[in-house]
């Protein structure tokens, strides 16, 4: 597990995007040798290439702003099992001459086509640093209690549920480390895909 923690720390430091001011998403300003019009065109091309139906995901498309609502796949581990999720998110592109800003904000989570009631499952991943085991367990405890309370559980039932939950959480921190790595890679891949597409030279596009 020590090697996994070290790898995560090294990987996270290599990311260009940062948490936004409200700590609920990611942001990055990218400088390019392109006009505002060229940036706008390439961003629209990227959306068309990466989404099944660009028309259904684009919420706003003006010369200086492009807003896209979509989702990406994310696998999360729980003990020895891995479950597929879809992370709904809003991508906002702000455009100027020679630079653009990417804002990515997760807005929801679903599993097998069903929306989950809360973002608490992934909020633990939107952090500027890797949580220590102690920090994670405190956050996990708070999240679980809030979840049970939102389901109308009494204090007595919450305590009973917490005891039951603790018996199944022996690998919880290790799961967090794996899931955090998957999360960070998914976010980083999205930003990298956008930047790589806009950095394509005209020579690469010639045919």
Question: Where do the language-model regions lie?
Answer:
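Bacterial Sec-dependent N-terminal signal peptides
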Residues: 1-21, 194
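Ser/Thr-rich, low-complexity intrinsically disordered terminal regions
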Residues: 17-207
């Amino acid at each position: 597990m020590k090697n996994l923690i070290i790898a995560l720390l090294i990987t996270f430091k290599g990311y260009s995007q940062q948490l936004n001011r409200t700590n609920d998403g990611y942001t990055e300003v990218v400088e390019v040798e392109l006009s505002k019009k060229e940036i706008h065109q390439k961003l629209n091309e990227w959306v068309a290439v990466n989404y099944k139906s660009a028309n259904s995901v684009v919420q706003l498309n003006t010369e200086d702003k492009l807003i896209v609502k979509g989702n990406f796949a994310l696998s999360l581990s729980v003990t020895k099992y891995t479950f597929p999720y879809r992370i709904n998110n809003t991508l906002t592109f702000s455009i100027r001459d020679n630079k653009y800003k990417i804002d990515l904000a997760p807005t929801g989570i679903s599993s097998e086509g069903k929306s989950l009631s809360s973002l608490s499952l992934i909020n633990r991943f939107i952090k500027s640093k890797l949580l220590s085991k102690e920090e994670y367990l405190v956050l996990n405890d708070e999240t679980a209690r809030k979840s049970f309370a939102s389901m109308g559980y009494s204090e007595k039932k919450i305590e009973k549920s917490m005891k039951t939950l603790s018996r199944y959480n022996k690998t919880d921190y290790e799961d967090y480390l794996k899931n955090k790595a998957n999360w960070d890679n998914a976010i980083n891949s999205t930003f990298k895909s956008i930047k790589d597409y806009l950095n394509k030279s005209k020579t690469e596009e010639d045919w």
